[in-house]
Amino acid sequence: MKMPLLVSHLLLISLTSCLGDFTWHRRYGHGVSEEDKGFGPIFEEQPINTIYPEESLEGKVSLNCRARASPFPVYKWRMNNGDVDLTNDRYSMVGGNLVINNPDKQKDAGVYYCLASNNYGMVRSTEATLSFGYLDPFPPEERPEVKVKEGKGMVLLCDPPYHFPDDLSYRWLLNEFPVFITMDKRRFVSQTNGNLYIANVESSDRGNYSCFVSSPSITKSVFSKFIPLIPIPERTTKPYPADIVVQFKDIYTMMGQNVTLECFALGNPVPDIRWRKVLEPMPSTAEISTSGAVLKIFNIQLEDEGLYECEAENIRGKDKHQARIYVQAFPEWVEHINDTEVDIGSDLYWPCIATGKPIPTIRWLKNGYSYHKGELRLYDVTFENAGMYQCIAENAYGSIYANAELKILALAPTFEMNPMKKKILAAKGGRVIIECKPKAAPKPKFSWSKGTEWLVNSSRILIWEDGSLEINNITRNDGGIYTCFAENNRGKANSTGTLVITNPTRIILAPINADITVGENATMQCAASFDPALDLTFVWSFNGYVIDFNKEITHIHYQRNFMLDANGELLIRNAQLKHAGRYTCTAQTIVDNSSASADLVVRGPPGPPGGLRIEDIRATSVALTWSRGSDNHSPISKYTIQTKTILSDDWKDAKTDPPIIEGNMESAKAVDLIPWMEYEFRVVATNTLGTGEPSIPSNRIKTDGAAPNVAPSDVGGGGGTNRELTITWAPLSREYHYGNNFGYIVAFKPFDGEEWKKVTVTNPDTGRYVHKDETMTPSTAFQVKVKAFNNKGDGPYSLVAVINSAQDAPSEAPTEVGVKVLSSSEISVHWKHVLEKIVESYQIRYWAGHDKEAAAHRVQVTSQEYSARLENLLPDTQYFIEVGACNSAGCGPSSDVIETFTRKAPPSQPPRIISSVRSGSRYIITWDHVVALSNESTVTGYKILYRPDGQHDGKLFSTHKHSIEVPIPRDGEYVVEVRAHSDGGDGVVSQVKISGVSTLSSSLLSLLLPSLGFLVYSEF
């Protein structure tokens, strides 16, 4: 969609027609000399809209303004079109910034702008609004409780307090801070009004709710009094149709902004929410939240304007809501004014073009003051027209400023900065333009001479308005000395150059047309004649674009022949379809050039078909039409239709009608599709040279729904809790749902029964149903079968399976339960097997004496085991233990409770190794005796582990002594671990490393020195 344009031109008219020499003055609106390097103010920072929190502790606010200028600018501020009184102590200036101390809403709220000026003029900044933000607390009154029947929908009102600005965010607390409600398909918090909506209330919703409101602009949050929500239990919750209660309104938004639409419905079951743009595709930047209740359109554009619809649906009915989005646009420059220098007495065309929606208006400022509205026309500029100009484009949604300085020039012609070239080359028979560009104001008159001959316009010679001289059909006689004369009312000047005639450049061997197949090579010849005094270069272009041989990717396919100076042959290697087109060879010198072209035809697989459209969408088929793509010079033999579903990223060939799509066809059907499935389609063309690129994929479509035709598999079940019949099956995957409101019908009857009992399971992802019946006989055989259904009908039943209802829990308790205390942390429990056949496992429950029985730990073992080990127990602690027999229906009665005590903890002190001495072929390791503490088990001996360093396994020794002899290691180092042993278990380890090398480790020295008082050094 194109936006309307507004065009405004500025043309300046002089009040005087002639001027003599002048003296430069420094006040607004005067011209400048050639040497003048100053310039008017250019804004680098301008004030922006600012919100000052009323409760801020900072005590000041700053509005920024900074301009670049020479000489430095002077700043001034205005508020609501009145001057800011800088003599007031509350106002101060820092550079160009305005600082307001102790801001007061009554005195300081308003619209501000900054003026920056120097002797070249004055400019005015964009306007900025200073506002005061606040968020009042919620009222202190208690909020009444809300009672709702389970299964019904409800809304809790937030009713936010007074505030500014309106950019609030809302969340809801549940019972305490910071536990926030998580939004899902059933619960929704509107960011428009803050209300909490629940599609249907459940017992788990019971609690106290508080609306939590945040203002990001002033970084403040408040929350309401808690609202008690009390769900009222219902024996059966009744379904009711979808009812949209959160509706979006017609909105006007700005192009480039993000737009949020909210739509939420009450209903039981929870309604599904779908979004669409009526009669048009959804914007590519649109995103739908996980719950479906929020549609966000990012960076909205004019083409996204239109009617949007949300639809809520459940098994009981649907509801729809529509509203329109209107997209407006801030003013935006198409072309704006820039700093300009013009000659005195000339006209100025200064375009100022803006676009926007609605159409912006144009107004002008000169030196900070209103100058004109709309188009401004003046002619024959004077010094009074110099100054700082601002073009302002504005509509209802904002304004934009374009600033520029206008300087008026007046000086006699001079060639000092841009003299004529001393030597100009031109080819015989060609054309030459000799430039003459002096600096002068006003624009001078031009005349030319060759030698002593004055030149006048003719069929071959033309003097341009800008002073340039054009000569056509050049001959040798045109060589010579040329002089350009420039004159205005302030003086005159001239400049001279020499024209030298060269031989022309000509193509003498032109490229010729070529026809090849993809992957082959082609050669384009090119040779030229040229003036030997000049250098010749060849330039190749492809379809009008110069080939850059310096690019690495170019070397793959293009190569030039550099063997001969006058030869520019081009080799095209491994040609691809993209290399087909027109190749042009240009032979050029600094004087002239000559070109010749030829066409390269590359035959290959077809290009992608275009214009793919989907029509006649049905449950298992769609009709496709497309337009023929390029055959790349080889006739198309057939087309292939490919599909991709939402469940896969892979494209697959589709079955079609007709099965073979001939190359002259542009329509066909894709058949054997999955009903109610989202598909994308594309078409691929094939010829004798291969298969081409696929078409652009179609828009995603959904096939019509149909009744399921696949039965659930793996139907079975059984087991479970007493008086239950558990039926299981493998849920059908999404591709077999075939329609909306998908679920299962479960049928079952006693094995010898006549009448099937049927129940409906609405959860499409479940594979389990449990039927409870207090009159059901345990371990009774049932026949069961399952079928799928959707809103289009029922599918076939599965094969009948035979399962048993849950058996009774065991009725006997294990007997002869006994325990054996193994250590401070382990107890062994044993019992006599229960003779009932229905026992599948045993459960041991145990708890410490200081704990409640409800906190008991459990250990489960199979029915073939008659003992179990309890580990990780507390030392020196009373424990209670009981054993029960269990099966899938539960556990039977427990045995009598056994009381026992764990032993005291093992010694906590490690043995202190006092020596490790080599004696012959053995090491003698000696340690101090470990004395147990009063709350530890008495030491009964020591365990020594002799193992290779880096390994965990080794040889274990036991002793009642305080030393042990171990063999000298043959290879590497060994570790000797020593620990005390007691009835409570093993104590803490001490260790020492030994090896076959006769040295004493530094770690061992630290052990020996304090106890022995001297260094023992042994050498064997």
From Swiss-Prot:
Tissue expression pattern: Expressed in the ovary and in Sertoli cells of the testis.
Residues making up the propeptide: 1002-1020
Annotated family: Belongs to the immunoglobulin superfamily. Contactin family.
Main localization, broad class: membrane
Cellular compartment(s): Cell membrane
InterPro entries in UniProt: Contactin-1_2_Ig1, Contactin-1_Ig1, Contactin-1_Ig3, Contactin-1_Ig6, FN3_dom, FN3_sf, Ig-like_dom, Ig-like_dom_sf
Disulfide bonds: C65-C114, C158-C211, C263-C310, C352-C391, C436-C484, C526-C585
Signal sequence segment: 1-20
Membrane topology annotation: Lipid-anchor; GPI-anchor
Stretches assigned to the Ig-like C2-type domain: 41-131, 137-223, 241-326, 331-407, 413-500, 504-603
Protein name: Contactin-1
Lipid-carrying residues in chain (GPI-anchor amidated serine): S1001
One example of a Gene Ontology biological process annotation: positive regulation of neuron projection development
Function per UniProt: Contactins mediate cell surface interactions during nervous system development. Involved in the formation of paranodal axo-glial junctions in myelinated peripheral nerves and in the signaling between axons and myelinating glial cells via its association with CNTNAP1. Participates in oligodendrocytes generation by acting as a ligand of NOTCH1. Its association with NOTCH1 promotes NOTCH1 activation through the released notch intracellular domain (NICD) and subsequent translocation to the nucleus. Interaction with TNR induces a repulsion of neurons and an inhibition of neurite outgrowth.
Annotated GO CC locations: glutamatergic synapse; myelin sheath; plasma membrane; postsynaptic membrane; presynaptic membrane; side of membrane; synapse
Sorted UniProt keywords: Cell adhesion, Cell membrane, Disulfide bond, Glycoprotein, GPI-anchor, Immunoglobulin domain, Lipoprotein, Membrane, Notch signaling pathway, Repeat, Signal
Residue ranges of every copy of the Fibronectin type-III domain listed in the record: 608-706, 711-808, 813-908, 909-1002
Domain of life of the source: Eukaryota
Membrane-spanning parts: none
Gene Ontology MF terms in the entry: carbohydrate binding
Glycosites: N208, N258, N338, N457, N473, N494, N521, N593, N935
Other remarks on this protein: F3 shares with L1, N-CAM, MAG, and other cell adhesion molecules from nervous tissue the L2/HNK-1 carbohydrate epitope.
Span list, region Disordered: 695-719
Subunit structure: Monomer. Interacts with CNTNAP1 in cis form. Binds to the carbonic-anhydrase like domain of PTPRZ1. Interacts with NOTCH1 and TNR. Detected in a complex with NRCAM and PTPRB. Interacts with TASOR.
Pfam families noted in UniProt: fn3, I-set, ig, Ig_3
